Amino acid sequence: NEKLINKYQSGEAIMGAVIEQCTQSGEPERFFLRTAKKQNVRIIGIFSPVHRSKKTGYALKLGKELARTYNVLYLNLEVYGGIGGHFPDAGQTVADALYYSRQEKKHLRAALAGMVKHMGPLDYLLPMRMSEDLKAVEIEEWTGFVEQIAEQSIYEVLILDIDCLL
């Protein structure tokens, strides 16, 4: 089962394709991406009932500062998440990671490695593009998703940028 990987693409895209191929091989954790057991994962929620409060800028700045010492993942859970502003337009989003967590619960760690983007030392997932998709996710599903990331990933700190409309 061969898959063509174009060498004229970003390193992230190449790594994502390699990880995806290894995930499909059966047991990716047997080959690579094992994580050491973490003591505790800190989950930091950033929330403001006031719109335009520069909350996202603050959350990103906090994430970058913490990422100097810890492995940090930033998740934007806002209805209008800043694509085109703070974040690029293209790439896999929180919606893709959430879908993957539903389908391949044991392999979320491998999928995340290919989905995350980087802002300096900070890792992040792009926000969902469609507000309806974000609103359709039940609180139990968000909780399970965050727990999966905490249990299966390398991240020691998760920063959740939470919207008041969620």
Language-model features and meaning:
Residues N40, M119, S153-I154:
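Short loop/turn elements that form and flank the Walker-type P-loop nucleotide-binding site
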Residues Q148-L166:
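Conserved catalytic-core segment of NTP-binding enzymes
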Residues I5-N6, S48, Y74-N76, Y124-L126:
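Structural signal for conserved beta-strand scaffold positions within catalytic alpha/beta enzyme cores
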